[in-house]
Amino acid sequence: MDDLGLSLREDDLNMMTSSRYSATTAQLIEALQEARARTLELVSDLSDEQLMGPRLRIVNPMRWEIGHAAWFQEFWILRHLGGLAPILAQGDGLYDSARVAHDSRWDLPLPSTAQTFAYMNQVLDRVCDTSDRRARDPITGYDESYFFHLALFHEQMHAEAITYTRQTLCYPRPRIGLRQTGDRRLPAESISGDAHVPGGRFILGDSSGLAFVFDNEQQPHEVEVAPFSISKTAVTNRELANFVADGGYERREFWSDEGWEWKRNAAADHPMYWRRESNGRWLRRDFNEWVALEDRVAAIHVNWYEADAYCRWAGRRLPTEAEWEMAASCEPSSDGGSITNNKRRYPWGNNSPTPANANLDWRAMGCIEVDALPEGDSAFGCRQMIGNSWEWTSTAFEAYPGFVPGPYKEYSAPWFGDHKVLRGGCWATRARMIRSAYRNFYTPDRRDVWAGFRTCAL
């Protein structure tokens, strides 16, 4: 990023930390420094009152969240790997998310904002001091690169969460010191219709030898996928508005039993953050501003139940996660009748994301038109499968065969069964973390996250 005084450009850091080749400790430390600078940018304009915010099930108090990110880094790098004593005597009781119930985080005796910033700086300073630290965990056998990546990606996830928390709480959009892409429309030749994928057997999950992947995708395995057709673009605001106009939120036949119960309890009659003016025009809330609904921009803040209901209305369905990954990462044979054995890390190939092929890293500060960024197309012609908006799949979040929890045992296993898989990342996801095989997961009722969807033919 710009204006941080770092010796490497952000694109260089993305390449190094997403490469199949292990980044050096110095490169990982620099990435940790950049990630911490971004975390601080995301909260630097907020008051003490705003940093605590209201008690809501779907967000954390941001003063707790940034302290937790620093504590996590300290726990795994300095304490677990380095064998050092805790910096804060009471830190585990404040910041260990496995021990501290969500609802209690507003009531904790948290350090002040200034003290929290000081703690964050102290942790990072010690992490940057590479002396007197073991290069490998003698118990698990994981090397320091694993724990550096774990802390890095964990903080990046919380940076994305802080961003959608600002949207939830109607705060101004964050002030981030990097070059923005400007016009979110980014006009390009319009595309529509489906891409046909011939199906076949392929390896689901990451098998490219990356230095780090989370435990829920560490067991790549062969699966059989039947031929299918998938939309070349995500569902747009205009398409979702047509569903609303046709009574989609009132017509029981489009909703699953669980979805209808959610809709009634939430009193939902249109997508979240939408508001209709007296003249019938739709507006949507973009952080603390109301803007006209953009027809060709990807629809976001849609939960799984809403996506499923839209599909039923449209005579479509959500893709499975295997279908989504095949459409994003596989290549058709020369005659189009099968897939090859070549699997790409990203839809466009194996090179790391850039602003020319993916809307990531806050550069557009929101979703862009679904026709934009043709350089990011998959081999089958699907656009924006990386970045812009997370995409719901029909698949429940479950363990891959042979699953073994990683050192951070609470990351995946507690959430198997009642969450749904999302793929692709969003505009606030870090380029260095996302790949086609990356699995995200949320409960199907979540509308606050930057999630949309694309559809498949029945």
Give a label for each model feature.
Residues 57, 139-147, 179-189:
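Membrane-interfacial loop-to-helix junctions in multi-pass inner-membrane proteins
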Residues 14-60, 64-71, 75-89, 93-126, ...:
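Disulfide-stabilized, aromatic/cysteine-rich ligand-recognition loop
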Residues 151, 155-157, 161, 165-185, ...:
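Functional-site microenvironments in short loops/helix caps that host divalent-cation chemistry
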Residues 6, 17-18, 337:
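Intrinsically disordered, low-complexity segments enriched in Ser/Pro/Gly/Ala and basic residues
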